[in-house]
Amino acid sequence: GVKDIYFVVGEQSTQVQSYYRSNIQLNDYLRRAGKEDKLPLVAPLRDVRIHFLTQPSTGGYGTSIPVGLASEFIKPGESAFVVMGDQFFWRVDVGSNAADLAELVEARGLSAGLLGNPVEEAFIPQTGIIETDEQGNFVRIIEKPKLEEAPSNLSNSSFYILNKEIFELARTLPANPQRGEFELTDAINAYIASGGVIAVGEAKGDYMECGSPSGWLQANNAMVELEKN
């Protein structure tokens, strides 16, 4: 299982660190209020080590930067989950997309994988769609294809298992010449071009996108409704 979690945070970030550390004031309040039963809900995670890496405010920008910062902590032969912080999946069946993807990667004898999120036809021309080969492994991402030309209904969910080679590519590749950003998809494409193979799994559950105000509000409203039920 996962024993170490690395959060890549901004230079002025404190919220994530505070959330995952013990809050003495909150603990004292719960005890005074007779709500000791709530203490386990705010306790730090057990049997796992939390690490924080700071992404400099100056320098490169893009999705490969935090992956490159974490590369030194990945040993040769190791793989690690990489999940972007502005999205998650909610599964009412209490299943785990992470566990499902790890099982798929292991079953295929590979060291890397990614999750595709099934989307409705109306959204296919608005997003990047994953193309796979006959074995269900990654070929490429086609940006905003026409519905009739889309190779699948799976969009990239930015949920990965990456090996040391891809971490190093994320650390060393230059910025994308068209967009000027350091993009993780460039590292993935370079790995494929070198003969690497990446499994593609299909995500289950509701996809919650929190990278925009409307998406963040929708995710919070969904959680409130679940609490009511």
Question: Locations of the language-model features?
Answer:
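Short conserved AdoMet
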Residues: 2, 21, 75, 193
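A short, aromatic/hydrophobic, helix- or strand-capping loop or linear motif
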Residues: 30-33, 181-182
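Residues in the short beta-alpha loop(s) of Rossmann-like NAD(P)-binding domains
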Residues: 9-13
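Conserved beta-loop-beta/alpha segment of the NTase-like Rossmann-fold superfamily
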Residues: 16, 26-29, 36-132, 171
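A short, N-terminal amphipathic alpha-helix
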Residues: 1-7
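Catalytic-core segments of class I nucleotidyltransferases/pyrophosphorylases
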Residues: 81, 95, 99-106, 137-229
